Amino acid sequence: MTAHLPILIVIIPLFVAMAARLLVRLSVPFTRGFVLAAALAVLASGAVALAETLVRGEPWRYYVSGWPPPWGIELVIDPLAGGLIVLVAFFGLAALVYAGPYLQGRTPREQGSFYALFLLAKAGLLGMCATGDLFNLYVFLEISSLAAYALIAFGGRRSIVAALRYLIIGTAAACFYLLGVGYLYAMTGSLNMADLAVLLPPLMDSPVVILALVFIVAGLGIKMALFPLHGWLPDAYSYTPAPVLAFMAAVMTKVSAYALYRILYFVTEAAGPVSPTLQVLGWMAAAGILFGSIMAIAQRDLWRMLAYSSVAQVGYIVLGLAVGNVLALYGALLHVLSHALVKGGLFFIAGGVSWETGVRRVSDFVGIAKKMPLTMGAFVAAALSMIGLPPTLGFFSKWYLVLGCLEAGAWVFVAVLVVSSLLTAVYFFRVIENAYLKGLPQPGARAERPVPPGARRFRLELPASMLVPILVLGIGVVVLGLFNEQIISNVIQYALPWRLP
């Protein structure tokens, strides 16, 4: 069974997605338990696969049906892919746990559709992490994207427009990527990443190869919301249900960034014409960092504030990839983990506050810390990590990015990182000031939930299934910050291109 872990990581959510749509007709509680058990199994499988890869000291290559590439489909799990698989699986489980109260008012059919679509999106992302060829990366990208379009529409009437817009832009992105892959296949006759890494270097001066890379970078840039290709993100993030949004914000853009990193550093080895590509990406990332931070300050709705903040944070990751030295790559890969934990937690918090009080506007957060102290405590921890204050994980990821930029002599990028941190402090401290330093809680869209006669007066500020993921992530950004050196030395340093065969 262990020998087949790479394929099981992808197959389990696919089969459970189909089963959930049928089982929900018999019993909703059983279906939910079944889905959660499957999500836990995927997380455990991913952790075992990552550990096995680290112990082996080489990538774990799995040939589907025993056919080796280029005729068969190859799955490859190395420390980079394994770490991201664990991250996707963890957030998939956390979001499913969190979604319980959100789904209580839904019909069994709607709940079954939600579970099926969510698991399809998760399977697509896991497949993107594990695949060893460019075409199947496209297939898994489309599986996750199509499911995401439908999940966004679960948010209500306004979310349907956002989902349609994302569908149109996302389809264009997929076409760009597929066109680029087609050009590479026409030039090399292979889609396998390992084969392309050997076949492409002699062809790197070809205009066709250069055009192919431009299309691939453009397609993945749209998917990861890299400025100025981010137009779909603010509306999509503003109207998506919180469990889905936390999952999307935490891992969907990160997996696209992973795919970009894979192609630039492992397939093309960042040589020849790719170097100008990295320079362009660096300036796009720097512009996105400033643009996202400034636009976040201008927002009055917390969800849109966090959405524009994501544009800036994607810029941090791409900036590290563009600078490209060891320290910058440490910072970029560590920021993938940091931002996933922080932004996933922040959207869990935003959803919990909205679910309990109806509050979404920053100005309505006045005094809310008195009503929801644990939730807002986690918010403060996440905000400090976003700003980049020690000992949170966000401080260390930004620290490595700054060191990498200094080593490269990129002083402008250093200034961008510092200014962005100050801007981030402005829009997060505005929320913290309202929550802790001003007055009593303001009435939101709903009145406070009444306590039934005869019930205990004490109750948690949120249902346990919502509060536990929030607290785990809030504590996690601090604890993992304290262990950042171990994360780098035991996982991230083995994910650099020159450490992998």
Curated annotation (Swiss-Prot):
Per UniProt, subcellular location reads as:
Cell membrane
Q: Name one Pfam family in it.
A: Proton_antipo_M
Q: Name one GO cellular component term.
A: plasma membrane
The main location is membrane
**What UniProt keywords are attached to this protein's entry?**
Cell membrane, Membrane, NAD, Quinone, Translocase, Transmembrane, Transmembrane helix, Transport
GO terms in the biological process aspect are:
ATP synthesis coupled electron transport
* Recorded topology in the membrane: Multi-pass membrane protein
The answer on whether this UniProt entry bears the keyword S-adenosyl-L-methionine reads no
Name the residues that span the membrane. 4-24, 34-54, 80-100, 112-132, 134-154, 167-187, 207-227, 241-261, 278-298, 314-334, 335-355, 376-396, 409-429, 463-483
**For this protein, what reaction is catalysed?**
a quinone + NADH + 5 H(+)(in) = a quinol + NAD(+) + 4 H(+)(out)
UniProt EC number: 7.1.1.-
Q: Please give the family membership noted in the entry.
A: Belongs to the complex I subunit 2 family.
Protein name, as recorded: NADH-quinone oxidoreductase subunit N
